[in-house]
Each structure stands twice: as structure tokens, then as C-alpha cells.
């Protein structure tokens, strides 16, 4: 089955699939077919000879990545069996576990198990408050990085916050572990501080589904991974289900202002 089988050349999905712009934004509500258009775009690129390892579909869940590959296989798209769609967290753990990256970051990307959090909380000194206060401090530390508050003008940590971060990171380094909320920030810092890193030029095409559900750090990681790539983002600017995970729906609304010559498609 060719990528354009049963696809109306006048349809939005067709226009998205053939768009050769460097930056593409697709805004559509739920159930309008935006993920279908993304699938056809991936199929068109693979059929056009783009190597599967130069193309990165980013999905919000692992199940969505598996669904995309299964549908492409059912279409008989050449090379789709080599395609590796991924969530950003999964990709982040893969990158951070590479030896050359570990040598730079000094952080082991082994996410702490839940039972390991108890000794962490116990080992943090009482000067940071009771157990509940220490838990809140850890959440605030993760939230600040998810929102990239450290990058905002005027943001300044108190002396106690700085001391807390130092003790927290020292503990994590010693125990060769990482908080789940540190994966993306560590990936962000690595990519930002190492613009010549091989990961920055790994992909020629990035395709990102449910962009509005990514937090600010995740959206910035997409920019860094796509420094030399064509980037297509897909999402609904009116619906974000993950505000409790610090989703940044404003990112899709202002994408045309933060990126040059954006090609817009709307359902």
C-alpha cells in the first residue's frame, strides 16, 4: 500500500504528508485525524528513501509508538520495521546511558525505585523540614526544571534551596541513581552544553505527536534534537490533559513565533 492510497490530494492530510517545510505545525482537535496525517507523512518519507534511523517519531506514550509502527507494517511501508518511535523519556534514558554521555554528565540514568525514596528522604537533614516538607522540596525541584524556571530572567534560588539541591544531587550521585523528573532536564543540559554532540545531528526528521502535552523542558529538547532537522509538531492547542505533569500548551500556540517560516495546517 502506497502512502497516498485512498488519500484525497485536496485533503489536509495529503498537504501535511507532502509538506517540505523545515518547521510544520498541525493544530487540530481530538478525533480530527491529525495522528492519521502524521502516519501518512512518516510513510511518505520512508517510501521516498529516508533511512528509518534518520527519522524520529516522538509520541507521548509507548503504546502510541507501538501503534504507529504496527499500522505502518500493515501498510507494507518499506523500512518501517527499522523505525524506532519513542517517548522522550525513553529516548532520554537511552542517550544518557551511553558511555560518552555518562563521561560528560557524571550522572547514571538509573531511575530510583519507589522503595529507594524512603532512605533518600531519611538521609536529607532535618534542616530542610519534616518528611513532608522534604517531599515537597523534591517535587518543587522537579517542577522547576520541567518548566525551565532556571532559565527565566530574575529567577534566583534561595540559599536553602541551593543547599537542598546540592545535598539531593550528591545523594543521587553517590547512589548512582536519578529521579524520574531529572531524565529530561539532564538530557536538556547535555544537549544544550554540547552543541557538537552526535545526538544533535542524528535525525533529519522529527515528528512529534500531542505536542501540547509536553512540558517546556521537553519542547526545548525537541528543538535541540532538531537543530539540523525538519520538525513537524502535531497537537491541540485547546486541550492538554497533563497540566499536573507541567504540560506547556502555550508552546504550540507560539510555535510560529519561536520558529522561523512555520508552515501551518489546521483541521
Predicted feature descriptions by range:
Residues 40-47, 70-74, 185, 189-192, ...:
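Short, well-ordered alpha-helices that flank and scaffold nucleotide-derived cofactor binding pockets
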Residues 1-32, 36-37, 54-56, 123-207, ...:
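Accessory N-terminal region flanking or inserted into the helicase ATPase core
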Residues 1-104:
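P-loop NTPase Walker
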Residues 219-267:
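Conserved RecA-like helicase ATPase core segment
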